């Protein structure tokens, strides 16, 4: 086998490191990491040294006389295992330790080499005598094979040469024992084959295997079945690949042996452990049996739990689709859609139908009606999430273990280089480990000529077509000429795009393209969506912004050397998606090579920089939350960069037509040649024993694509194919099912085959077979984008909501609702409006590609991943501008994410949808469509009640709301707090009004937008590429919000000090002013007595009384005069004890309470949006709650007034609230913010549960208006409650107001209060109690059902508290 190649791949210094590089250039050293199998050597023991030698020549003991049933091996065949070379022959020079590169830099090795277990000694055998003079355990190391999990044996013997071991930084990579030799000639290591007991057969396996788990061991019955199956006559291919049992027994002759294959014995072929994936062997005799016996011989796999049983469609043309229930609006992949798992849409829009097809259609209709009747009672089942179904099938512990197994790094090796690559150190260029040979260069030229330039040649052969220009094109041209220099208020081409942009004209223009493949197949044009241009921004706006694929801090990358693997400058990552739903298909792309099947499992990504400190990429597609993992692994070496680029252009440009996916960046398109930021390699693998993988070399993939590039139905064979038996034709059609075929020059060029039909419409004319493709019409062209349907749908939803909240529903209203529902159903059933379409194409001109839909499914995840990685790399540039490095990178991304942003495809969304519909899997499994708005929806009274009824989490919980409004809510409180504190200390003589004026000037959005511009946040913000933020005023407002979110993120992860430093640096550019702002003086009372002023208590009766309050609350103030000033009312004049009253402290205390309450709500209420959090905070930090807490603490008894009589005075609610806020400020000044947190944890936050259960977060006036709006009549202005003042009595300083509230001309409530506002609140509360509002009753029932036990406990506590004073009075009596 390829021992020498893999030997060099694995252990050349500078090439055997985790990414397969290590040579030139300044590169940070790998972090210190110590594998678990290292063992400390004795201090006096010298470090072990190892010497690896290439495999020895075949032993003469291997002779043809001993194996008469086998052909003699070819000269380059290496037996397993080879004996040690005799000293007379002279061993080959050992593998060089250091490549002969100039200025080659080695990575730092570990202090001691790893202790690997030595190879067990070979068993005695007459054909394999032990080599004399060879130390035990010494041998070659041709492959990267992990060591068995065994106890550590004694250390290996000392060898004359030392090797530097290098380990990947991210995970432990296991290596084989130094003495492991995969080519030892030990014929007795394995039992003889069943075919010839006297013939020794050899397996390329480790000399000892890992112990298997109990549940993985094959039972005797299964082993017997496995052996029986091995001797059956199952072919592995068609045509010349068909091999009978007789041929398998006699082996392959040397002259018929393929030069690129490696000779393997029948024992080896038959007993190779089955792969972890499905083994898709093709058979011409037993079509159904092959799947059955594959299931029996397949080994346990972690992907099996996610796979569904493969259901054949038989000979039927198509299966009926489920009818769409009313109100269901399916959309394209990544949007809301509703499909079934195994039903396909019926063919429609067919011009010519044969009689047999009409009979089939009648059967389809019957099955459709029968299926719809059976499903009528279970509409909601279709909305069940795929993740929930899988959670029921698979236990949670098992799912977690399987996902860990999926993400666990594996040891890999490449298939043979076959003279396409050279790994000779003398041939290397720069820091490569593999260089392409002239044979590989010829292969690249052939691939580029036959496949790479095929599309361009076909387009050039067609006559050019100039599309007619629309008014939008003229506006864009005029906008680019003027550069928008005169338009300061807008960054869009027009202020009213809806008036200028004619969507219908744009769609007609795309439909009129002469090269269009079919009317119902939509294609991609650069910079265009299905209904017009992707970007309608001005030329000035296109020069910046993430939405234009311009990532700050990106620089052009020097091109890689095309004919080498550039191992020293590329970093390799394996890409995998979890969960694997919709990515593991029943028809994967399989490449047969050397009697093995290599199954497509995803892509490898090569980056030019290490992907450190980049979080996982999460995206919603098919209504399922996916996570894209990029796992660092050992680099597969047999590839060259030019081969990767040829494949990428073939797949992404010619097949998928992703024209708007730019991996270089628009800024570098016209610059000198530069390299793409990422290279991609398809991974075709087969599983090896002990959990390893063999990756197919890149040249074999290109050869496979060249072999597959043949006509789908050759013109010269049409007549022959039409004469095939039905079974033979059905098998060919099944093989083509799911295949991607291409018609060069058409739009779109490639499509997936769902059915292949050879029925002839005209018996006199032979026609090509028909390709049937089941596609999805774009949303803009189906009922989902129809303005009439949208208008009718909105009116239907509004009427349904009104009837649900109406106390009495009229029969006419019910009929009106039913009529609208029926009208919606009719629109959905129109052929021109259906989402599912059936496309029929002639197979003439179509070519096979060898690619199936699973490759396209994985490929469409790559734009999302590359956008995610590039964005997080540019955020590192933002870290430098901020002066703070975030540890939680997702938190920084969240701060930059505007609510309008949605990460769907990472590029032009219509391009991705079209490519998925044309080339993706036919019927993806969809999750619950609610996943899109489950945590994002915040409109509607029902959503408000649902969210506001949720109690807080006991432990801090991360939020699932993926935009920055919540962080903006927190950052706003932080900015207000910092501003208030600094102004309070810097201006000790300024009154509350002046402080509030200065604070308003600092925290207003216009000023915060200026600070955001200093950080260039507009270049980093993520927001929708549309008209939302086109106007400069809207963009400035969004930038101010983004700045507040950034301050909140810094405060949340860093500290208050970090947020203070950042805010100070941005406020003042002058270092002196910044120093004044940041280093403010102490409070005047603290400056008078720097240490403490408690010595004044003895001489001051006022302070003596305050010590009682200190004992009551358990806090001893260092400067007790601060507490005295907090309790000094405004009516008290200036005195030397307090130096003023408490109005300034009230200003500071309000900001402190806002910050502490905001942080608590942000952490413990993760499902609440900004508006919901504001409602909760308003219920906590208001005069009523504050006055209640102050009264419970008895603060009114310690209030310092100018009343000489010292009589107890009943303070107003506002005065009590001011006392509490002033106390909070004094507590912060004397202690710190931690004391305030503790105080509010005890006195305020426990009240939240009562506020939520009683719905006290909603004031009576707002609640009454909400209830009245639910009773509005359709087509009329909604009736709202009106308040009228009926009476005003009392003097001017103590008046009482009487207010009544009217609804629809009827008085429904009345209230009294010391102010008009309080009287209106009383009137609204009275109306809610007396008037029978259905919405109010619904809210009460909702809370009662949800928190029945909590409400009982709360009522019991309230009754207990009310009885306590009465019991105390009875005891006194």
UniProtKB/Swiss-Prot annotation:
Mg(2+) 2 binds at residues 1146, 1218, 1221. Residues 47-69, 160-169, 185-200 have a biased composition (Low complexity). Residues 875-1055, 1106-1232 form the RNase III domain. Residues 1259-1333 form the DRBM domain. The 2 RNase III domains form an intramolecular dimer where the domain 1 cuts the 3'strand while the domain 2 cleaves the 5'strand of pri-miRNAs, independently of each other. GO terms for biological process: defense response to Gram-negative bacterium; defense response to Gram-positive bacterium; miRNA metabolic process; positive regulation of gene expression; pre-miRNA processing; primary miRNA processing; regulation of gene expression; regulation of inflammatory response. Residues 389-1364 are annotated as: Necessary for interaction with DGCR8 and pri-miRNA processing activity. The keyword Hydrolase applies. Belongs to the ribonuclease III family. This is Ribonuclease 3. It holds the Pfam family Ribonucleas_3_3. One of its GO terms (cellular component) is nucleolus. The record marks 1214 as: Important for activity. Its EC number is 3.1.26.3. Component of the microprocessor complex, or pri-miRNA processing protein complex, which is composed of DROSHA and DGCR8. The microprocessor complex is a heterotrimer; each of the two DROSHA RNase III domains binds one DGCR8 (via C-terminal region). Interacts with SP1 and SNIP1. Interacts with SRRT/ARS2. Interacts with CPSF3 and ISY1; this interaction is in an RNA dependent manner. Interacts with PUS10; interaction promotes pri-miRNAs processing. It comes from Mus musculus.
């Amino acid at each position: 086998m390829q021992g020498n190649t893999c030997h060099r791949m694995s252990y050349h210094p500078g090439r055997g490191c985790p990414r397969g590089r290590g040579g030139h250039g300044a590169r940070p050293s790998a972090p210190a990491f110590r594998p678990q199998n290292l063992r400390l050597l004795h201090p006096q023991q010298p470090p072990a040294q190892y010497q690896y030698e290439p495999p020895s020549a075949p032993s003469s003991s291997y002779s043809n006389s001993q194996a008469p049933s086998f052909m003699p091996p070819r000269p380059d065949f290496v037996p397993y295992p080879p004996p040690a070379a005799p000293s007379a022959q002279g061993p080959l020079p050992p593998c060089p330790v250091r490549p002969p590169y100039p200025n080659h830099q080695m990575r730092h090795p570990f202090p001691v080499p790893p202790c690997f277990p030595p190879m067990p000694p070979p068993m005695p055998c007459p054909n394999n005598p032990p080599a004399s003079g060879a130390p035990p355990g010494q041998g070659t190391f041709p492959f990267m094979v992990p060591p068995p999990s065994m106890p550590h044996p004694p250390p290996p013997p000392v060898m004359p040469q030392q090797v530097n071991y290098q380990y990947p930084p991210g995970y432990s990579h296991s290596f084989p024992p130094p003495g492991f030799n995969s080519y030892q000639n030990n014929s007795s290591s394995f039992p003889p084959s069943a075919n010839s007991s006297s013939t020794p057969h050899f397996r390329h396996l480790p000399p000892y295997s890992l112990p298997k788990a109990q549940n993985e061991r094959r039972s005797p019955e299964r082993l017997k079945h496995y052996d029986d199956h091995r001797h059956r006559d199952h072919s592995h291919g068609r045509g010349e690949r068909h091999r009978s049992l007789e041929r398998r027994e006699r082996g392959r002759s040397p002259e018929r042996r393929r030069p690129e294959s490696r000779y393997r014995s029948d024992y080896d072929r038959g007993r190779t452990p089955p792969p972890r994936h499905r083994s898709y062997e093709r058979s011409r005799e037993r079509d159904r049996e092959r799947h059955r016996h594959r299931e029996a011989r397949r080994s346990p796999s972690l992907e099996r739990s996610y796979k569904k049983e493969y259901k054949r469609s038989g000979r039927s043309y198509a299966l009926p689709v489920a009818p769409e229930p009313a109100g269901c609006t399916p959309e394209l992949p990544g949007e809301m859609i509703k499909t079934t798992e195994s039903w396909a849409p019926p063919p429609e829009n067919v011009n010519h139908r044969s009689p047999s097809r009409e009979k089939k259609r009648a059967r389809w209709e019957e099955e459709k009606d029968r299926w719809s009747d059976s499903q009528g009672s279970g509409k909601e089942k279709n909305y069940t999430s795929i993740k929930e179904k899988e959670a029921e099938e698979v236990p949670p512990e098992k799912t977690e273990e399987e996902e860990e197994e999926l993400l666990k790094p594996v040891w890999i090796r490449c298939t043979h280089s076959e003279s396409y690559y050279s790994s000779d150190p003398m041939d290397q260029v720069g820091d490569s480990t593999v260089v392409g040979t002239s044979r590989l260069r010829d292969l690249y030229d052939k691939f580029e000529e036959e496949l790479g330039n095929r599309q361009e040649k076909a387009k050039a052969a067609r006559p050019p077509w100039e599309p007619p220009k629309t008014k939008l094109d003229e506006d864009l041209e005029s906008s680019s000429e003027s550069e928008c220099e005169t338009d300061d208020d807008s960054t869009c081409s027009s202020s009213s795009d809806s008036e200028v942009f004619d969507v219908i004209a744009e769609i007609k223009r795309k439909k009129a393209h002469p090269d269009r493949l079919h009317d119902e197949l939509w294609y991609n044009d650069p910079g265009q969506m299905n209904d017009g241009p992707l970007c309608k921004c001005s030329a000035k706006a296109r020069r910046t912004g993430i939405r234009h694929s311009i990532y700050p801090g990106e620089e052009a990358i020097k091109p890689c050397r095309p004919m080498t693997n550039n191992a020293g400058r590329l970093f390799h990552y394996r890409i995998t998606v979890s969960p694997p739903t919709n990515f593991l298909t029943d028809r994967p792309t399989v490449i047969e090579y050397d009697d093995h099947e290599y199954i497509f499992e995803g892509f490898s990504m090569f980056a030019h920089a290490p992907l450190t400190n980049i979080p996982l990429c999460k995206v919603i597609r098919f209504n399922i939350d996916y996570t894209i993992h990029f796992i660092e692994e050992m680099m597969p070496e047999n590839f060259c960069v030019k081969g990767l680029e040829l494949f990428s252009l073939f797949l992404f440009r010619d097949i998928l037509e992703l024209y708007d996916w730019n991996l270089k960046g628009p800024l570098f398109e016209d610059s000198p040649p530069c390299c793409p930021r990422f290279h991609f390699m398809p991974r075709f693998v087969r599983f090896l024993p002990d959990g390893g993988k063999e990756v197919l070399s890149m040249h074999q993939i290109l050869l496979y694509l060249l072999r597959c590039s043949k006509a789908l139905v050759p013109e010269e064979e049409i007549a022959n194919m039409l004469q095939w038996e039905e079974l033979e034709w059905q098998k060919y059609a099944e093989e083509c099912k799911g295949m991607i075929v291409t018609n060069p020059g058409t739009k779109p060029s490639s499509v997936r085959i769902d059915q292949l039909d050879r029925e002839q419409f005209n018996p006199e004319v032979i026609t090509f077979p028909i390709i049937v493709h089941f596609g999805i019409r774009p949303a803009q062209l189906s009922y989902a984008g129809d303005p009439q349907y949208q208008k009718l749908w909105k009116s239907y939803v509004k009427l349904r909501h009104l009837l649900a909240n109406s106390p009495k529903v009229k029969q006419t209203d019910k009929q009106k609702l039913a009529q609208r529902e029926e009208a919606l159903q009719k629109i959905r059933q129109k052929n021109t409006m259906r989402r599912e379409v059936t496309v029929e194409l002639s197979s003439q001109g179509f070519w096979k590609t060898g690619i199936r839909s699973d490759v396209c499914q994985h490929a469409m995840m790559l734009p999302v991943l590359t956008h995610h990685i590039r964005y997080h790399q540019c955020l590192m540039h933002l870290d430098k501008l901020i002066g703070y490095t975030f540890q939680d990178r997702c938190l920084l991304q969240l701060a930059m994410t505007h609510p309008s942003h949605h990460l769907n495809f990472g590029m032009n969304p219509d391009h991705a949808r079209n490519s998925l519909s044309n080339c993706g899997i036919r019927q993806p499994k969809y999750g619950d469509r609610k996943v899109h708005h489950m945590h994002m929806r915040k409109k509607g009274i029902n959503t408000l009640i649902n969210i506001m009824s949720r109690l807080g989490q006991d432990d801090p919980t991360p939020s699932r709301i993926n935009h920055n409004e919540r962080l903006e809510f927190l950052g706003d409180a932080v900015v207000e707090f910092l501003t208030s504190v600094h102004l309070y200390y810097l201006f000790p003589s300024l009154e509350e009004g002046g402080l509030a004026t200065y604070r308003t000037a600092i925290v207003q959005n216009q000023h915060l937008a200026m600070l955001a511009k200093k950080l260039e946040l507009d270049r980093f913000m993520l927001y929708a590429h549309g008209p939302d933020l086109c106007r400069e005023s809207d963009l400035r407002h969004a930038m101010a919000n983004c700045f507040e979110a950034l301050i909140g993120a810094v405060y949340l992860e860093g500290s208050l000090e970090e947020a203070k430093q950042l805010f100070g640096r941005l406020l003042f550019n002058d270092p002196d002013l910044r120093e004044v702002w940041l280093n403010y003086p102490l409070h005047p009372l603290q400056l008078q007595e720097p240490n403490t002023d408690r010595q004044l208590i003895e001489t001051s009766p006022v302070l003596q009384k305050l010590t009682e309050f200190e004992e009551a609350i358990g806090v001893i103030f260092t400067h007790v005069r601060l507490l005295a000033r907090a309790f000094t009312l405004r009516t008290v004049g200036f005195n030397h004890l307090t130096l003023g009253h408490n109005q300034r402290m009230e200003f500071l205390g309000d900001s402190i309470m806002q910050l502490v309450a905001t942080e608590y709500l942000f952490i413990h209420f993760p499902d609440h949006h900004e508006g919901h959090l504001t409602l909760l905070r308003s219920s906590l930090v208001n005069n009523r709650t504050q006055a209640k807490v102050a009264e419970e603490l008895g603060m009114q008894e310690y209030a310092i007034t100018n009343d000489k009589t010292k009589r107890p005075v009943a303070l107003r609610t506002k005065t009590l609230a001011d006392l509490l806020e002033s106390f909070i400020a004094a507590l912060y000044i004397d202690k710190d913010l931690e004391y305030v947190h503790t105080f509010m944890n005890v006195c305020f936050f426990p009240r939240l549960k009562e506020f939520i259960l009683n719905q006290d977060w909603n004031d009576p006036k707002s609640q009454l208006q909400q209830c009245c709006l639910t009773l509005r009549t359709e087509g009329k202005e909604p009736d709202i409650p009106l308040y009228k003042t009926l009476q005003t009595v009392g003097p001017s300083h103590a008046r009482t107001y009487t207010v009544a509230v009217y609804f629809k001309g009827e008085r429904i409530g009345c209230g009294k209060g010391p102010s008009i506002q309080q009287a209106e609140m009383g009137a609204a509360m009275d109306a809610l109690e007396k008037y029978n509002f259905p919405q109010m009753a619904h809210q009460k029932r909702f809370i009662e059902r949800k928190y029945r036990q909590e409400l009982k406990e709360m009522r019991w506590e309230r009754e207990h508290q009310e009885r306590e004073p009465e019991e105390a009075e009875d005891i006194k009596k």
